[in-house]
A protein has these predicted regions:
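Glycine- and acidic
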Residues: 1, 16-18, 46-52, 62, ...
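Internal maturation/activation junctions in enzymes
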Residues: 1-37, 222-244, 251, 262-266
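Structured core elements
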Residues: 16-19, 32-36, 44-46, 51-52, ...
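Short Gly/Pro-enriched turn/cap motifs at secondary-structure boundaries
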Residues: 23-26, 56-58, 75, 111-117
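A short core secondary-structure module
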Residues: 42, 46-100
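A glycine-rich, basic-preceded beta-loop-alpha segment at the flavin cofactor/substrate interface
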Residues: 51, 90-106, 111, 118-149, ...
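Alpha-helix capping/hinge segments and adjacent helical runs
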Residues: 114, 220, 241-326
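Extended amphipathic alpha-helical segments enriched in small hydrophobics
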Residues: 150-231, 318-327
Length: 327
């Protein structure tokens, strides 16, 4: 922690989550990346990871990869996955930048959207890795990353909704087309602004409602997180787990709901813009392209549903979380 966290918090080093491989994404029990023990207590990491956000760049001095891999004697499936730190540059004795680790970028993906994010294929060729936590318990540790990332992806969905609305509203006020069926609204103009047309108003109000409602959901989740933090600071384990369970139950709802609605809001934006919505220069088509990934990464919408019902409601609490939430 003393070696890595100060650099990561300061932003001089950055990090990645290396889970997905060519043959598996959601089903991480199929992970094939190997971790062979070295005599000095480190591990030799070999394998290929794909879809790694910011996997390679020169924006920071070092990139710290958090990698799921298997030890030689690991059990099959998800019970045999361990977690490793694999830095791009091995830290020197003084905490600075040391020698280059054999982690290379095989390619950068050419994507439909989020093109400013370098999505990399990473090859690990006996790279030096350091075990995090217990052997074969890596997936449990990684889920602490993933749950936080799912909340962040829900916020991404909210951002796309709000951006679509903020762009659609002024366009609808300025663009003029015909007279409304309910009567002329702007007699001094050649035609009424399209915001007065019922269908356009409906789409704008839908964007606005989803955006404001989504923001309320984010605040609700933030309250749970604040309560968890407060309990942790007070050393109250029972209270911490109470709010952790609530946030865990709420996370797949928030992630799945807000990301799906972000696509709908972007779709409405393109409809409001008409033909201009299909043209790159106007920007609305980029929102539609960028929003699409949010329903896929950090667990697809279907996976969120399985997590909610299977793990959070039935397996973990036998329905107690629902009863507590609605009480």
């Amino acid at each position: 922690k003393n070696l890595y966290l100060p650099h990561l918090v300061a932003g001089t080093w950055s990090g990645t989550m290396c889970l997905t491989e060519p043959q598996c994404g959601t089903d991480l029990g199929q992970v094939k990346t190997k971790a062979e023990p070295n005599a000095d207590g480190t591990y030799a990491i070999s394998g290929t990871k794909i879809f790694i956000s910011a996997g390679e760049h020169d924006l920071t001095e070092n990139i710290i990869h958090i990698v799921l891999a298997r030890l030689p004697d690991a059990p099959a499936g998800t019970k045999g996955i361990s977690l490793f730190i694999v830095p791009k540059f091995i830290p020197a004795a003084d905490g600075g930048i040391g020698e280059r680790n054999p982690v290379t970028c095989g390619s950068i993906e050419h994507k439909m959207g989020i093109r400013a994010s370098a999505t990399a294929v990473l090859n690990f060729d006996n790279a030096v890795g350091y075990l995090i936590g217990e052997k074969n318990k890596g997936l449990h540790a990684m889920f602490t990353f993933m749950n936080t990332a799912r909340l962040g992806t829900g916020m991404e969905g909210l951002a796309h909704m709000e951006l679509a609305f903020q762009n659609s509203l002024p366009y609808a006020k300025e663009r003029r087309s015909m007279r409304t069926l309910s009567g002329t609204k702007e007699p001094n103009q050649v035609a009424d602004a399209i915001i007065h047309h019922a269908d356009v108003a409906r789409m704008l109000l839908t964007q606005k409602a989803f955006s404001e409602g989504g923001r309320s959901m984010i605040y609700h989740a933030s309250r749970y997180a604040d309560k968890m933090f407060e309990a942790a600071m007070l050393g109250d384990d029972a209270e911490f787990h109470k709010w952790d369970d609530k946030l865990g139950f709420y996370t797949p709802i928030l992630k799945g709901f807000l990301t799906e609605l972000s696509i709908e809001c972007a779709k409405h934006g393109m409809q409001i813009y008409g033909g201009h919505g299909y043209i790159k220069e106007w920007g609305m088509e980029q929102i539609a392209r960028d929003a699409r990934i949010s329903t896929l990464y950090e667990g697809t919408t279907g996976v969120q549903a399985l997590d909610l019902l299977g793990r959070k409601v039935l397996l973990s609490s036998k329905g107690k979380v629902v009863r507590d939430y609605t009480a």
